[in-house]
Each structure stands twice: as structure tokens, then as C-alpha cells.
Amino acid sequence: LICDGFHINPAVLRITFRILGEDRTVVVSDSMRAAGQPDGDYDLGGQMVQVRGGHALLPDGTIAGSTTNLHEELKNLISFGIPFRQAVKSVTINPAREAGAADRVGSLAPGKLADAVVLDAATYDIRFVLMNGSVVYRA
């Protein structure tokens, strides 16, 4: 599921999360190379893409991809009314399991990589990021 609030209507996401349940929802970013870039026109691999208001569109108005990331999508899910635990699982252990990588990533457990993003409990902003147990980013 792409949970940028553009690809899929938030009401449809709420229904989907309710039907699929806590362990079957998987969120992906579908981010393209224009992700994080300001509004403008971009040539991405010979394809013209217009970024307007954070949305990537082809010149005919077709969605060209997403300009969001999983952190933004997690915050979106919470704002759409998805329970926190279900939202977190949809961007961590569930995709890791579907990719066959749950033995290494997706949750914190002995023997797994110590990768984690620590969020502010009130705002869900990133406080710091751990990769393999080392802090690689601190807000």
C-alpha cells in the first residue's frame, strides 16, 4: 500500500487495514528520484515528471510515482486513524517478512541487525537513527 494520501484515499486505507488486520498490511513508499525535491519539472530517465504539491505526475496528469518516504507514510497512517501498533508493523516487520528478511530486520531481537528509528512520542518526528547498533543520525 502506498499511504501518501494521494495514491489511495484515506477512507479506503482505513477499510483495507481493518480487513487485512495487523499482520497482513504492508506499506511501501513507491518513491521515485524526484522524492525530496522541490516542485518543478524533472527529466527522470527520459520521462518528464512534474512535481506539484509533493505529487509526481506525468504531463497528462497520470500519477508517476510517490515523492514520500516511509516515515511520512507512518505519520499519515496515524493521522488517518490507523492504530499506532498496526501502522508501525506495516512499515517494519510485515514488509520484512514478505521480503524474506524478517530473520535479519523488521524488529529488534537478539541476532538481528540493530537498526531502529526512534521517534518523538508526541510528534512522531525522528529523534535518532541506529544502523547496526550505531547512531547514524541525531535530530
Residue ranges and their predicted role:
Residues L1-G5, V12, T16-L119:
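His/Asp/Glu-enriched, well-ordered alpha-helical/loop segment
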Residues G36, I126, R138:
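Conserved protein kinase catalytic core
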Residues T123-V129:
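Short, Lys/Arg- and Gly-enriched loop/turn segments at beta-strand edges
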